[in-house]
Regions:
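Hydrophobic, helix-forming membrane-interacting segments
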Residues: 1-64
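Intrinsically disordered, low-complexity terminal regulatory regions
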Residues: 38, 45, 49-161, 290-294
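Short, flexible loop/turn elements at secondary-structure junctions
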Residues: 145-147, 230-232, 246-248
Length: 294
């Protein structure tokens, strides 16, 4: 690695220092020693050579920056997931220490809703870190419902866990039926996720319902909403949707990389969210088990 780095330093030194430094000396060579046309041909060739490899070097640098950004973001994701597991372990340890576990009355010795909310908050922190947007401009919301065979109408209603995302003064189960919401499209149109760097553009396409809070920020912001579920190979027992929104800030406004929106979308879906998906789906499974055991 050190040898490669030293070669790169030497290459950049030649391209950006030596070659430009040589050109003025070529210009000063007397015509008696070198033909004028040959002299200018050398200068043009050196300039073309320098420009070409300088451009190529910048392209490589941009790719390396993108790669480094993705790797750093994945580290943020892994670190956040690790902290969630540690907090859950500490909660169990604390409750056993003070004899707070009563399996007869509660088969699970911790608050599942609180833990799912904690996972959502940690995911929000990761989004904040990789987009460089302060936490106060980001909100997360998580909703879920039971969909197992034979569940009652009450159980099949959507419920919210944590999150402070305003629902435009509309009751949740009425809100998800609005055709201009991300929830509606994910629930009814078999769309796995919705990602938009501009809420306003999504709203124009009928995929996002602008809220009162959005209007406070002139409808500036981004949204990411994705579906999760717990079940077995035969059926699904419970499903949920996590939504991350920004207010007054776009996901990519602080990202100085090419195709920032596509890079961020693919990175969240393929590299970052899978950590949190497994954590949340596990808790949804425990939520279902506790529910049917009552």
């Amino acid at each position: 690695m050190k040898v490669i780095k030293n070669k790169k330093i030497l290459k950049d030194f030649i391209l950006f220092t030596v070659l430009p430094f040589v050109i003025p000396f070529i210009v000063e060579i007397p015509e008696q020693l070198i033909n004028v046309r040959v002299k200018w041909l050398f200068i043009v060739l050196i300039a073309i050579f320098d420009f070409y490899f300088a451009y190529k070097s910048l392209i490589i640098k941009e790719k390396n920056n993108n790669r480094e950004y993705i790797q750093q973001s994945i580290r943020y994701s892994y670190s956040g997931a690790h902290e969630i597991i540690e907090r859950k372990r500490d909660t169990l340890s604390h409750e056993t220490e003070f004899n707070m576990i009563d399996v007869k009355n509660n088969m699970l010795p911790y608050d599942i809703h609180f833990h799912i909310s904690d996972i959502c908050k940690e995911f929000k922190k990761v989004i904040s870190s990789i987009t460089k947007i302060n936490n106060e401009y980001i909100t997360t919301a998580f909703i879920y419902r039971y969909v197992y065979e034979g569940c009652s109408e009450k159980d099949s209603q959507w419920k919210r866990i944590g999150g402070i995302e305003p629902i435009s003064k509309c009751e949740l189960n009425n809100f998800v039926k609005k055709e201009d919401t991300t929830y509606y499209h994910i629930i009814n149109n078999n769309i796995h996720y919705i990602f938009g760097d501009s809420k306003e553009e999504l709203a124009k396409q009928g995929y996002y319902h602008l809220s009162g809070r959005d209007e406070m920020y002139n409808n500036v912001g981004s949204v990411f909403s994705i579906k999760l579920a717990f079940g077995n190979n035969a059926t699904t027992f419970v499903e949920g949707i996590i939504t991350v929104t920004t207010h007054g800030k776009f996901f990519t406004e602080n990202m100085d990389i090419d195709n920032a929106s596509s890079v961020l979308r693919n990175m969240i879906i393929d590299e970052i969210f899978p950590y949190y998906r497994k954590l949340i789906e596990t808790e949804l499974g425990l939520l279902y088990i506790r529910h049917i055991s009552k």
